[in-house]
Swiss-Prot record:
Entry binding sites for a divalent metal cation: H194, H198, D402
CDD domains according to UniProt: ASKHA_NBD_OSGEPL1_QRI7_euk
Binding annotation for substrate: L217, I218, S219, G220, G221, D250, G265, E269, S373, N374, T401
Name by which UniProt lists this protein: Probable tRNA N6-adenosine threonylcarbamoyltransferase, mitochondrial
Species of provenance: Arabidopsis thaliana (Mouse-ear cress)
EC number: 2.3.1.234
Any one Gene Ontology cellular component term annotated for this protein: mitochondrial inner membrane
């Protein structure tokens, strides 16, 4: 008997990449899964496409069947399998990335196409222009990743792709490409949460990293403190109530007239080395808020006012500034960086205490995301982590910024435990509507740290990854 998966809203069910665990219908894929999971499976039937009232609108609905995997191999530590090979595709913001990763953790290839010129031209990410840039290079990036791995699509076990959070226009490019590859070569497809990928890539580089662990995920669009209980289950201890730290770094770099080709973070970090970090008095945000949430909008305002007071002209690049002007810019950069990281330190310290109350066995804290490549950030946070008798785990800078490796690895982790979807149709109409999740929480909020984020009050938010997986698990239990 076929059971309709009803735990998600109709808006989400269009492209639900985390349904109840599915078994592929094609015999060759069934053999593949039997090999990886050492399980014998029956061949189920699927009803995938269900048209809506509009003749030009098609909606994918996923069904689970009477044939289910109730228990799959799972390990709190990374589970390595040489036979698995996954292609990961990432287009959530301004980098077009693809990578091929083997189940044993070997990175076979990694390709990234940057939009640095567009960032300079528009002073940040322009969604429509970013989408067009992704579309121009996505085919080449994916092909280059396969070529560098000396593989073809036929050698892949699955395709993983970021479906959120991120910019809808950009996400769509990656999802469309992933579905075409998966459909043309009858490959399973795994939808990946962008922030979970930032956290889990640390398990690729640090084999001792087991659940549960703490994670601070810091980037241009996100500040997240999460407790990772196990794969797919997270508690959100803190988030940003307005702007993320990466956004503050980018704006500071722009106002100081720095070179934005490498993004604002590295530019501010480099200039800060020349400055006095205590010369400009900035207030630490949310100093008296006894939670783990972040706010960088006010610090941005303080920086802008300090720049105006020094009459710094952003149109004059720092390379052309006078000695005094350059020193003023360096002092502001250093002072900003110090206070921005102090804010991280205070919230991280409290979050670790909360996490240890919930999961006393925690041994590691992961720091990942684009801002985690900042050496000053790593140094300061390492002191906090060591004082709590934990070990800091930071992926190398190339895996902190957005990349295809983290998507492929996260896809591997979920694929091993049966969280994937069957191959999509080989052809889909141009107006096909995908389920993209631009605002998609990673975990459930911890009661002590509930956020009052302005950006979240009116935005359409999908159920968190954790709640989706938990709901399906409960539904399976009630039927067994």
């Amino acid at each position: 008997m076929v059971r309709l998966f009803l735990t998600l809203s109709p808006a989400i069910s269009r492209f639900n990449l985390y349904p109840g665990i599915s078994i592929l219908a094609r015999n060759n894929n069934s053999l593949r899964l039997q090999k990886h999971h050492k399980l014998k499976t029956k061949t189920p039937t699927f009803s995938l496409i269900s048209p809506s009232s509009s003749p030009n609108f098609q909606r994918t609905r996923f069904y689970s069947t009477e044939t289910r995997i109730s228990s799959l191999p799972y390990s709190e530590n990374p589970n390595f399998d040489d036979n698995l090979v996954v292609l990961g595709i990432e287009t959530s913001c301004d980098d077009t990335a693809a990578a091929v990763v083997r189940g044993n953790g070997e990175i076979l290839s990694q390709v990234i196409s940057s939009q640095a010129e567009l960032l300079v031209q528009y002073g940040g990410v322009a969604p429509k222009q970013a989408e067009e840039a992704h579309s121009r290079v996505i085919d080449k990036v994916v092909q280059d990743a396969l070529d560098k791995a000396n593989l073809t699509e036929k050698d892949l076990s699955a395709v993983a792709v970021t479906i959120g959070p991120g910019l809808s226009l950009c996400l769509r490019v990656g999802v469309r490409k992933a579905r075409r590859v998966a459909g043309n070569f009858s490959l399973p497809i795994v939808g990946v949460h962008h922030m979970e990928a930032h956290a889990l890539v640390a398990r690729l580089v640090e084999q001792e990293l087991s659940f549960p662990f703490m994670a601070l995920l810091i980037s241009g669009g996100h500040n997240l403190l999460v407790l990772a209980h196990k794969l797919g289950q997270y508690t959100q201890l803190g988030t940003t109530v307005d702007d993320a730290i990466g956004e503050a770094f980018d704006k500071t770099a722009k106002w100081l007239g720095l070179d934005m080709h490498r993004s604002g973070g590295p530019a501010v970090e480099e200039l800060a080395l020349e400055g006095d970090a205590k010369s400009v008095k900035f207030n630490v945000p949310m100093k008296y808020h006894k939670d783990c949430n972040f706010s960088y909008a006010g610090l941005k305002t303080q920086v802008r006012l300090a720049i105006e007071a020094k009459e710094i002209d952003a149109k004059c690049p720092v390379s052309s500034a006078t000695n005094e002007d350059r020193r003023n810019r360096a002092d502001i950069a250093a002072s900003f960086q110090r206070v921005a990281v102090l804010h991280l330190e205070e919230k991280c310290e409290r979050a670790i205490d909360w996490a240890l109350e919930l999961e006393p066995s925690i041994k590691h804290m992961v720091i990942s995301g684009g801002v985690a490549s900042n050496k000053y950030v790593r140094l300061r946070l390492n002191n906090i982590v060591e004082n709590k008798n934990l070990k800091l785990v930071c992926p190398p800078p190339s895996l902190c910024t957005d990349n295809g490796v983290m998507v492929a690895w996260t896809g591997l982790e979920h694929f091993r435990v049966g969280r994937y979807d069957p191959p999509p149709p080989a052809t889909e109409p141009e107006d096909y509507v995908y389920d993209l999740r631009p605002r998609w929480p990673l975990g459930e909020e911890y009661a002590k740290g509930r956020s009052e984020a302005r950006s979240m009050r009116t935005a359409r938010i999908h159920p968190s990854l954790t709640s989706i997986i938990r709901a399906d698990s409960l539904q399976q239990q009630t039927q067994t």
